[in-house]
A protein has these predicted regions:
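Hydrophobic/small/kink-forming positions within alpha-helical transmembrane segments
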Residues: 1, 24-28, 54, 77-80, ...
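Transmembrane alpha-helical segments that form core, pore/gating elements
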Residues: 26-28, 61-115, 143
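Helix-helix packing/entry segments at the starts of transmembrane helices
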Residues: 15-22, 85-105, 137-173
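Specific transmembrane alpha-helical segments of multi-pass solute transporters/efflux pumps
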Residues: 1-19, 49-55, 133-151
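Hydrophobic transmembrane alpha-helices of multi-pass small-molecule transport proteins
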Residues: 38-58, 75, 107-108, 161-162, ...
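Membrane-interface helix termini and inter-helical loops of multi-pass transporters
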Residues: 7-8, 54-67, 111-129, 172, ...
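Loop-to-transmembrane-helix transition segments
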Residues: 1-2, 41-47, 67-75, 120-140, ...
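C-terminal transmembrane-helix exit sites in multi-pass transporters
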Residues: 3-5, 22-44, 54, 165-184
């Protein structure tokens, strides 16, 4: 909910940067608190990758409000906590199923209130939402839970900075958006950061 309301008070590009910066900071903090070694080179790599996200998003930062920053930071912190929690899970599939079931039940009441006095809900919309949540999103969460336990939390946070780069690259292929020098530079920085901070 924070991400949905947050983007009403902050530009998409700026919100993206705030989100990934908070995720990265949260996962570095997790490593520190859990006494996981955090080599300086790994922190440098994380900062270089985050700089790549900054290069990608800065030109289109748009409107930035304190409320928008706060809500996207809360979203990033929540995802960092969810990621950190997954590091102790032995059965990613069962854990994700349980999480999604609890969330679905918790959202039934506000959805019912919204439907009763809000926008029209169609069968197609409900089916697509269910597929996106129960299939694509759930499978990606299971895969992420299974993979990220093999790397440090800091590295897990750094790896996630690839997502906005891949999204922008996909937009050039699928939506015909222009491939820019900034996108190339951002990609180079992100992947350079991953290489610098790679596990040794």
């Amino acid at each position: 909910m924070c991400i949905s309301f947050g983007y009403q008070h902050i530009g998409a590009a700026a919100g993206t940067f705030v989100f990934y910066a908070t995720v990265l900071a949260g996962l570095v903090a997790y490593d520190v608190v859990s006494r996981t070694p955090v080599p300086r080179v790994r922190v440098v790599g994380a900062l270089v990758s985050l700089a790549g996200v900054g290069v990608l998003t800065a030109p289109a930062a748009g409107d930035v409000t304190p409320l928008g920053v706060l809500l996207l930071a809360v979203t990033g912190a929540a995802w960092a906590l969810y990621t950190a929690a997954g590091r102790t899970v032995t059965d990613p599939q069962t854990a994700t199923t349980g999480n999604f079931t609890v969330l679905a039940v918790a959202l039934l009441v506000p959805v019912g209130v919204t439907v009763s006095g809000g926008p029209t809900v169609t069968t197609t919309g409900l089916v697509l939402a269910a597929l996106m949540g129960s299939v694509t999103t759930a499978l990606s969460y299971v895969a992420w839970y299974a993979c990220q336990r093999r790397i440090s939390a800091t590295t897990a946070g750094t790896v996630q900075t690839v997502i906005p780069i891949l999204t922008a690259a996909a937009a050039t292929v699928l939506l015909g958006e222009r491939l820019t020098v900034l996108l190339v530079l951002a990609a180079l920085l992100v992947f350079a950061g991953l290489w610098i901070g790679r596990p040794r």
